[in-house]
Amino acid sequence: YSFSVNVEYFDGDATDQFFLKLAYTDANGEAQYATVAEGTAVKGEWVQLANKNYQIPADATNMVLYVETAESTNNFYLDEAIGAVGGTSILGAGESKPFHLGDVNADGVINGMDLALARQGVSGAFSGNAARLAADVDQSGSVNGTDLQLIQDYLLGKITEFPIAEKTVDTAAMEKLFAGITPAASYKAEGENNPLFTQRFGADPGVMEYNGRVYVYTTNDVIEYDSNGNVTENTYAQVNKINCISSDDMVNWTDHGAIPVAGTEGIAKWATCSWAPCAAHKTINGKEKFFLYFCNGGNGVSVLTADSPTGPWSDPLGKALITRATPNCGDITWLFDPAVMVDDDGTGYLCFGGGVPDGKDAMPGTSRVVKLGEDMISLAETPVTIEAPYLFEDSGINKIGDTYYYTYCSNWNTSGNSYGMTSGAIEYMTASNPLGPYTYGGELFPNQGKFFGLYGNNHHSICAVNGQLYLFYHNRSVEKAMGIEGNYRSPQVDQITMTDTKINTVTGTMKGIAQQKSVNPYVKNPAEMMSDQAGINVRGLGDTVVTEIDKGDWIKVSGVDFSKGASQIILTASSKSGCAVKICTGSPTGKAVGYAEIPAGGKLSEVSAAVQGLTGNQDLYFVFSGQAEMDCWIAK
């Protein structure tokens, strides 16, 4: 067959790549997408996409012809879409002439004729839009004396490429624009560092320190609805991903995305759920390896492995690590909630289990600890029972000094106990051996409802960072701020203090931890690193991008050290329809230090904002006027 269509666009870059494609279903029932024709269009000029001898695959059904761009989201127009017998030449706009800045007549070279045509265009008119775009060598949007001088300098050998003009931002117009924009509301109050992130929920924090950076892995709670669209109680049935965030200052957290663990799209496709993660790293055969343990509902503990704390992750076993067929595990009520520790000698230990058999509130006997194999994905011995009084769930295992600590959540029937413990609280036990026996030590964290008013299951991790101990736990602060109630949880952190081997009671706060170090603005910082936000989301995995930005949305980066000053901030961002960014300090309504304009077209590009007044330690805000995505930023 012979196919042809004409394409034209008016937004974005000077050129764009277009494809005429055929979507079809093959004999195996799989969707296929084949290129019929392609071409490069110059903005404002028609281009023809044509192939006069295209062979449609013999097994193709459900066929659709369509046009798309290579990367951008530019609006475009189509005309004269024609199909004919193979070999037919279809008259159309034809191919675009080669486009190069400075080559005004499109003859493939830049010479005196191009300079003459550019001068003629400045004083009169260009032969077409392609000629005008080629003469605009500094890409300022207009052709003027600056372009003529640059072409002349190029011909004289003074320059070898054309510099891009910095767009002058109309500050008065920007001030007027943002005066009419109300910043979106955050789920955190000013001065609060808890919860750690708010763009998604995140429960059951499992924490790992690696090279001075803290990685927090959480159950990705998903809001559930009834048939009428009302929020219902969290059943955890839809949880098949694990969130990963990290920080080196305990306040600004980088969102590495939600790891697809279970289900048909997951890494462990045989699993249905991914709850209560924990993580560890270990040097094996001279190489650092990372291990992410999770539970497949209440019926087994599984493990993923990677060469980096953010993945990509793989399923080394293709099945659970611990099941009810594992010795001494068949009668565990809830076979879940793993916690892992790598001892000083490199030996790994895993705790797990939970649940309260009928009549055994005081001593459920459902917790286990096991020595792992050298590979961290096998068991070296039979799991040992931990006699933890009033156990409910949520195991933890740590070595502090020379003492091993087993920590857990107490059950809901603790009244009258002899230990002085309360219900749904984090308790601790101590031992001189990671396999026990353990002796009850005390209560280190009451139920979070005591501090925040919303009671629920308690789940924690203890992690040492730079010699300081921290308690990570979850709370229901974000769902409260959203005005919903269904046990949807978010991670928080507060400091642990000790008296000898006694863990002092931790107080839960919304203020959280003070920032441990300043942010360096003179290196590229990911946009997904933030201390607070309103309205945004994050897409991707590992190397992510801030997305779903709309009018009034914003990102906050706390404690940025501008001791060297700054004259510009460069953003890497995109917008389908164009977007302005207000860069300010103190609050989303604070005084602007500069503005940036993201061009339309949907293509990630660097945009620069001239800034002034940035000195000392500042909380930096990026406030947006419309739809956008943002990848990173750097100050110069």
Task: Tell me what each language-model feature is.
Residues 1-19, 49-56, 65, 80-85, ...:
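Extra-cytoplasmic beta-strand recognition segments
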Residues 6, 43-50, 60, 288, ...:
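Trp-centered recognition loops
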Residues 11-25, 63-65, 76, 291, ...:
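Beta-strand acidic-aromatic groove motif in beta-rich domains, primarily in extracellular
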Residues 21-30, 373, 588-589:
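Short edge-strand/loop segments of extracellular domains
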Residues 28-37, 589-595:
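Surface-exposed loop/edge segments in extracytoplasmic proteins
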Residues 59, 68-85, 486-490, 625-635:
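Extracellular carbohydrate recognition
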Residues 90-172:
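Cellulosome-associated attachment modules in secreted, modular CAZymes
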Residues 170-594, 599-636:
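Carbohydrate-active catalytic/glycan-binding domains of CAZyme proteins
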